[in-house]
């Protein structure tokens, strides 16, 4: 039985992305915006979807998300509640009574988390009490603002400390290169350290890549964050498809992430998606029908990535593809063979990829919903460009001492700026680790130092196994 997953959405970005995610899940499971089943007449039909992973269900066929919503100002959560009246458990919604926000400052959000930590953890404990086979968390947030970064960081630390045997995954949005938040490099470097230290798997997005992709795939040329957030929701839905529409493989978060994370430090994943069928993104441009062969190869195109990539020849450590639609297994086999010739894998990594054939929702059909679509999570050394940009932007303003006064009242900075320097050092360590992972003897060196992988003491998975390929 697939375990339950609790979603925690923090700050404006986290709650706006969460709104799109829950809308997508509701459509895929035939649930209305008020939580009522849209198909009560099908009560005698055995459902093939597992709503229990993300929803509680009462005796009146009403569904409530396993979700907690946090923010320090009311607008984003208010919008969620207006769009989904009565959908969320009101006891799982927290808006700061002061409603002042975090002023785009990491330390304000982090200190608020320290102040309210007992109350926050009590909310989480109660939600866990309503599960029967709790599997883990997914945190949705931005790394650049004040609440998503600061409060999100505090919650990450608390979750990994209290529930260290459970999976803690994140969907983390990085900012555009051009931003009006002057302390963005500080917020990002402090948050990235917590993603390194306290997350088991982090799926990264950046707004520049998202905006470019949105402009390409939508008919409407006026892109908005609601549209880019729907792209993120499409990835989140696809990652969990095999949990919610269970298959005999990849039906848990550990089974997915253990294929992607070779060592604890290297747990950052770059998502790609193509094509966007109308059951994922309403208003997507028309496109020709593609085979699974075409889709798998197109997922490697950097224009379909949701993280900006600075190289055309990335080195891959591990790859997981989730396909939906009318897939021919012969096309999958041909694509796997082609990637072995075309894609550069780390020397110690088998030149294969994991492919999961998921199922489309019977409740969310559209004109092209039987078309093949694909989502890829890639663990690749090209992800270091995100970290290098973070470090570079931090160095520029930190060396000038610019805007440090915004952090001087933070509890962590009462005795100086060591936390900034330590965070930079931790991030540089991961950059070095990814670069080292391109070498043939990398895994031998790691195994000599530490045999632990995702989930604690799990052994390295043999990803060459035919049973693991399709």
From Swiss-Prot:
CDD domains: gamma_tubulin. GO terms for molecular function: GTP binding; microtubule nucleator activity; structural constituent of cytoskeleton. Transmembrane segments: none annotated. It is found in: Cytoplasm, Cytoskeleton, Microtubule organizing center, Spindle pole body. GTP binds at residues 144-150. Its main location: cytoplasm. SUPFAM superfamilies: Tubulin C-terminal domain-like (SSF55307), Tubulin nucleotide-binding domain-like (SSF52490). Belongs to the tubulin family. This is Tubulin gamma chain. It comes from Eremothecium gossypii (strain ATCC 10895 / CBS 109.51 / FGSC 9923 / NRRL Y-1056). The lineage of its organism: Eukaryota, Fungi, Dikarya, Ascomycota, Saccharomycotina. The gene is TUB4.
């Amino acid at each position: 039985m697939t375990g339950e997953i609790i979603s925690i959405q923090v700050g404006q970005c986290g709650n706006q992305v969460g709104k799109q995610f829950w809308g997508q899940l509701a459509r895929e499971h035939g649930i209305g915006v008020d939580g009522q089943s849209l198909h009560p007449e099908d009560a005698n039909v055995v459902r093939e979807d597992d709503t229990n992973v993300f929803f509680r269900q009462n005796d009146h066929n009403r569904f409530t998300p396993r979700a907690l919503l946090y923010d320090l100002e009311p607008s984003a959560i208010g919008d969620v509640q207006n769009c989904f009246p009565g959908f969320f458990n009101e006891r799982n919604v927290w808006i700061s009574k002061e409603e002042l926000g975090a002023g785009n400052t990491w330390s304000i959000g982090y200190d608020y988390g320290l102040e309210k930590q007992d109350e926050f953890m009590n909310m989480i404990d109660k939600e866990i009490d309503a599960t029967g086979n709790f599997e883990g968390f997914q945190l949705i947030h931005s790394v650049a603002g004040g609440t998503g970064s600061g409060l999100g960081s505090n919650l990450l630390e608390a979750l990994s400390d209290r529930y260290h045997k459970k999976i803690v995954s994140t969907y983390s949005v990085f900012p555009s290169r051009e931003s009006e938040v002057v302390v963005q490099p500080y917020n990002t470097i402090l948050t990235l350290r917590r993603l390194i230290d306290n997350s088991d798997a982090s799926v990264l997005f950046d707004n520049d890549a998202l905006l470019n992709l949105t402009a390409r795939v939508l008919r409407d040329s006026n892109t908005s964050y609601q549209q880019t957030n729907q792209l993120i929701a499409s990835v989140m839905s696809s990652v969990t498809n095999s949990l919610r529409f269970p298959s005999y493989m990849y039906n848990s978060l550990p089974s997915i992430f253990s294929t992607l994370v070779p060592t604890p430090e290297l747990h950052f994943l770059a998502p790609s998606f193509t094509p966007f069928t109308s059951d994922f993104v309403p208003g997507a441009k028309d496109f020709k029908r593609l085979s699974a062969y075409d889709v798998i190869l197109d997922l490697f195109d950097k224009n379909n990535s949701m993280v900006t990539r600075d190289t055309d020849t990335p080195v891959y450590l591990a790859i997981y593809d989730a396909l939906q639609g009318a897939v021919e297994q012969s096309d999958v086999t041909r694509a796997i063979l082609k990637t072995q010739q075309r894609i550069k894998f780390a020397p110690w990594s088998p030149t294969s990829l994991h492919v999961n054939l998921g199922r489309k929702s019977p409740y969310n059909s559209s004109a092209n919903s039987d078309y093949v679509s694909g989502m890829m999570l890639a663990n690749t050394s090209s992800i270091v460009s995100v970290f290098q940009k973070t470090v570079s932007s931090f160095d520029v303003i930190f060396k000038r001492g610019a805007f440090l006064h915004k952090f001087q009242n933070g509890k962590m900075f009462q005795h100086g700026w060591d936390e900034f320097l330590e965070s930079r050092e931790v991030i540089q360590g991961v950059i070095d680790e990814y670069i080292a992972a391109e070498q043939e003897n990398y895994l031998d060196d790691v195994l000599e130092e530490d045999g632990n992988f995702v989930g604690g003491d799990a052994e390295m998975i043999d990803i060459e196994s035919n049973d693991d390929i399709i």
